Structures are given as C-alpha cells and as structure tokens.
Amino acid sequence: MRGDSFIWSLATAIPLLSTAVESLKVVKRDNPSVLGFDIERFQAAKPVHRDIIAKRASTKTISQDLDNQKNLYFCNLTLGTPPQTIRAHIDTGSSDLWVNTAESRFCSSRRAPCSQGGTYDSSSSSTYQLVNNDFNISYVDGSGATGDYVTDVINVGGIKLKDFQFAIGHTSSSPLGVLGIGYEAGEAQVTRSGDQSYPNLPAALVKAGHIRSNAYSLWLNDLSASRGQILFGGIDTGKFQGKLQTVPVLHTSRGDYTSLVVALTGVGIRTGSDGSIDTFPSQPVAVAMDSGSSLSYLPDALAAKVYNSVDAVFDPANNLAFVPCSMANDKRKLVFTFSSPQIAVGMDELVIDLGPDANGNEATFRDGSKACVFGIAPAGSSISILGDTVLRSAYLVYDLDNNEISIAPTRFNSTETNIMEIGTGENSVPDATGVPNAVTSAQVTQATGLPGVETGVPGSRPPSSKAAGQAKRPDFVLGVAAVGLAGAGMLFAAM
C-alpha cells in the first residue's frame, strides 16, 4: 500500500462463532472458547498495484496483505513489554506474523510510510528473544521483507500470549506488516530453510487453550460495508444463509498441506430470472481461497470466457480488464461451484472504481463513460486465486486441523449474531454437511493467453457499437491509474 487506502481493523475482542464443518463438533455454549475481531474499514491507497506485482512472484508460498481492491483487512495488536501497537494485515494465504522496524531504510524514509502501521523496536522490550535470522519473504521485483525470527509477548483481541514467535522485517517495502494465519507448514522458515515449524497465531491460541480447534471463520461483508468479522475457534450462524457445506483442502503431490486450496469445479453466469446458470466449459481448477488478494485470478482460458460474457476489454499492459462503471448495476451474477456449494457474486462486488489518478483525472472510455476495473484477472502461470472480489459473497470456515473449508452464501450487513464454538473430533454437525464425492484433485493454472478477448492500447479504438454496457478502451493511458488499483497483493516466501 502506498498512500491512502481502505484498511479493515480487526480490533475488538468479542465472543466468537465456530464454523461448522463435517468433521468439527460445533457446540452452543454460554461462554464459548472463541476469539473474535470486528473488521473495520480504513482509507488506504493503491489497492491493486501489489496484487499485480505479486502475481509475478516466482516462489511457491503465498503471503498476502488482504487488500480487496478498495479495502485492506487488518488487526490491531501489541507486541513486547511495554506494549508496542501494530496494525497488521490478516492473511489466510500466508503463515507468519511479520512487522516492520523503524530503522529499516523503507520505514525511515522522509515520507515515514510505516507510521500508519506501526513498528516494533526489540531494544525497547524486556521480553524480546532472538530465534534466528532466517526470515525472508519476497516479491518477484525484489521487494518484500527479510530479517529475524524472534519471540515476545503478543496481545491480540484482549488475549495475551507469551513467547510468541514472529518476524521482524529489517528490510522491507511494505508500510504494514502481515498476520498470516495459514498452515504452519507454509511458514517462511519451513519453506525457505527447511526448519521446523512453530505455532503461529491460530495454533498458539489452541496450544494456550483459548480455542479448541485450529479453525476460524471469515465474514468480509460487502464492498461498501464498514465492518466484517473474523472468528478464531467459532462460527456465527447469523452471518450466512442455509447450511455450511464442507469440501476438502487439496494437498500437494507430496501429500503435504501448505496452502488453503480447493477444487473449483465450475464457473458460470446467472442471467435469467429463473435462476438458470450458463456454465463455461472447464476442468476442475485448484484455487487458493485467499482473503489477502484484492482481485481473483482464473486460468487464462476461463478468464477469457468470463470477459466475453460481460463484454470486458483486457489491457495486457496492466493485466487487468475494464468495464463501464455502470455495470455495477447489472443484475447478472457470476456463480462459482465447488463440487456442490456455490458462491454467487453480483456485479456490484466485481466492478471496482479506480478513483482519480494523482492529477485528479478519472479513467474514461472514448465515449466519455467512466471506466472501472473488473475484479477477475488472468492467472497466467501462477496459481488461480479467489480473492476478496469473490470471497466477500461467501461465509467461509477454514479448518486447518481437518484440512477442510466450509462454504455458505453470505448475509450481507447482517446484524444477527448466534455464536457457536468449534470443538474437536470428526463428528458431523447440524450447521455443516460434507459434500458427497467432492472433487479431491484439480489441475493447476496454465498460461494460454486470452483467446477471443478484445485487447489493445488504451485509446486505440473508437467507441464500441455494441449494446450499452460493453466496455470500450479508456482514452488515456491507464498505467498510472492501474498503479492506484493494486493495494496489497500476494507475497511469496522465498524458496
């Protein structure tokens, strides 16, 4: 993030809801073992740029900043004795907490870019201990963070953990640190150095007895909402419709679970009032369910079919598609299927307003209509990702103990709350059912280009003669505007 942007603050300790999944026991208790945070929005800048950069990363472990095109999702926490306040991105796609230090070249620059996120000073903490110097997360362009693994006291959501391991970024290029909550096997010291894993935040909460299972639920709410919610060790049945349906997380060819990846078995568009869906032909695709990615990334051929269905125009210079901003009022929905459960995503969640550039100019098409980014991008040779443009329309339960993800349609802006605790074991629960014969393997992304999709240099063609709502090329170069799009993207742990 560079400049102003929307940030979501996960700050308040509240009773949390347990996510129900096939192998989890969900229990209604008067005092559930759940840790929860409200997710609050804060103005942030350039939510798309680092998504674009990060997609070029060459390493295998994903780490993300939780930007959702306009929004970052972050939590307030403290580290050390006495406490030092930090804002860190909540990220299901990575596994380490890392924070900046004020002495880094990036943070000590004249613009003081790290003042918003806060920094950690190990010399000011009486409980600091050095672990090793193996921390290294990097972007493909050489940016990222390197430094030390340390232990210290952490306080998050009113819960204090002693001797908690995290990383200090002595060299970094991000003004905000990252709170990764993925698999321990995805930690940078494991993937880079082959060292043993350590208990990251969800695992440490289990170890300390604050929650019963290494599982959490995520409710991002809609694009314009001021609050969402994450619950460690619980679910909130007031935040989703119907029943949770559980699908397996896919493992690597070695049988390891390192990323929260499931099989996407279908993508289509719902066009009629009868609810019928026109499905785009495709084989099952392995997709990361990654709240840290602003955009969603599909295999090139599948992205091309989506673009053609909504008359989007692709800009290869920025790896983005554009549509008229008026498409946000379109009633069609993209539908994503996972063996059985579906996420139906409205156009109002997929059409992203760029806002003005540094000179106050807004992107427009040659006919004068305002141009917006479409929230689906081609994955190229990288893994496919369902980011915030899709995940906002779902209620998700990430069960790392049982290697499952449960999915239900979200209830946008719901004020209803019903907290349930996630227990342990393999008993089925009323709020979640396993999907029979769920797909357990899927192909990885292959770069094929975008056959049949209209492309071109901005301003290179006249206004389209097609039906109203078709995207036309913006009439000024979008390189600057697109930089303002990219906010936080995915980090890849260096291998």
UniProtKB/Swiss-Prot annotation:
Proregion residues excised on maturation: 468-495
Glycosylation sites: N76, N136, N413
Function of the protein: Probable GPI-anchored aspartic-type endopeptidase which contributes to virulence.
Pfam families cross-referenced by the UniProt entry: Asp
Membrane association type: Lipid-anchor; GPI-anchor
Location(s) in or outside the cell: Cell membrane
Gene3D superfamilies membership: Acid Proteases
Organism of origin: Trichophyton verrucosum (strain HKI 0517)
Region (Disordered), start-end ranges: 448-470
Domain Peptidase A1 span(s) in chain numbering: 73-408
GO BP annotations listed: proteolysis
Signal peptide: 1-19
Family to which the UniProt record says this protein belongs: Belongs to the peptidase A1 family.
Coiled-coil stretches noted in the UniProt entry, renumbered to this chain: none
Organism superkingdom: Eukaryota
Top-rank EC class of the record's enzyme: hydrolase
Gene behind the chain: OPSB
Principal place of residence: membrane
Name listed for the protein in its UniProt record: Probable aspartic-type endopeptidase OPSB
Alphabetically ordered keywords of this record: Aspartyl protease, Cell membrane, Glycoprotein, GPI-anchor, Hydrolase, Lipoprotein, Membrane, Protease, Signal, Virulence, Zymogen
